[in-house]
Design a protein with these regions (language model features):
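Hydrophobic alpha-helical membrane segments
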Residues: 1-288
Length: 288
């Protein structure tokens, strides 16, 4: 991985061969980033604990508040119902982002040769809880607006919502590392994330594709089990059982895929911010 101030334009990018050659290079880099991220996870399997904690935490949170929301549905005060719904929507997002922040912190520890301790990483993430809460609320609001646009405007709304969703995902790709490593306030974390994405857009997109393909391959056995079992089942109960077994087979792969994505994200953040890569990624020529 070569230091530099930002992405360079591949030679001959003005022609068709240069354009597609550049895309191939970016995608190739993305697959190599995914492979190196898998190597980091093999060396530090504890990193995969954080997505598990997130999943368990979301389920536990929903179980706790579901009764309150049920009561709120019959409440006379609309404010109580709205507040309960807001908690139901924002709470799982907060739990997920908190665990994601802890994983990001643990990944940096692993890159720097320290043991990625679970407790220390969660304490570090909790020290940024105001920004994490703000980001969770923003995510919920933006997500609701995009869904509303998609559902209310037909095909045109679907297209616009999809484009805006991709743009939002790109703009906010580095929000969690910016919060964890820079303690950025809510008003600037999205702006700084967008700047970092601009500097590494090709590598980031390549990494997302590479990690996405790896994650798909990891969950493919579960999809196959669910699909084959569903079509071979002779009863509704058998079909449901096949789907449940397939989900159980796919979940570990899904959690590993989430972990790989965050490992690659921290590596890209380090490169964009410090112009140097973690040792595990140092020989990748990212900007070619």
């Amino acid at each position: 991985m070569r230091a530099g101030s930002g992405p360079t334009v591949p030679s001959g990018s003005g022609g068709r061969g240069g354009l597609f050659g550049g895309l191939r290079n970016r995608l190739g880099t993305g697959f190599r980033l995914a492979g190196r991220s898998l190597g980091v996870l093999r060396e530090h399997p504890r990193l995969a604990v954080f997505p598990v904690v997130a999943a368990v935490g979301v389920v536990a949170f929903l179980a706790v508040v579901l009764g309150g929301v049920t009561l709120a549905n019959g409440a006379e005060s609309p404010a109580v119902a709205v507040a309960s719904l807001a908690v139901l929507l924002a709470g799982p997002t907060f739990v997920t982002v908190l665990c994601n922040a802890a994983l990001v912190h643990a990944t940096r520890d692993a890159f720097e040769g320290r043991d990625p301790a679970i407790g220390r990483s969660f304490r570090a993430a909790l020290s940024h809880w105001p920004q994490i809460l703000a980001w969770a609320l923003v995510s919920v609001v933006v997500g609701a607006l995009l869904r509303s646009l998609e559902e209310s405007s037909g095909l045109a709304g679907d297209v616009v919502a999809a484009v805006l969703s991709m743009g939002w995902a790109a703009l906010t790709y580095f929000v969690v590392p910016v919060v964890v490593f820079e303690d950025a306030p809510a008003r600037s974390m999205i702006q700084e994330s967008g700047r970092l994405f601009r500097d590494t857009w090709g590598e980031t997109m390549g990494a997302e594709v590479g990690v996405g393909v790896v994650a798909f391959l990891l969950v493919l056995p579960g999809i196959a089990v669910a699909g084959i079992g569903f079509f071979l089942a002779s009863t509704p109960d058998g079909s449901l059982l096949a789907l449940l077994v397939g989900a159980l087979v796919a979940i570990p792969g899904l959690l590993v895929g989430v972990t790989l994505g965050d490992i690659a994200k921290v590596a890209l953040y380090r490169f964009a911010r410090d112009d140097e890569a973690p040792a595990e990624f140092a020989d990748l020529d990212v900007l070619d």
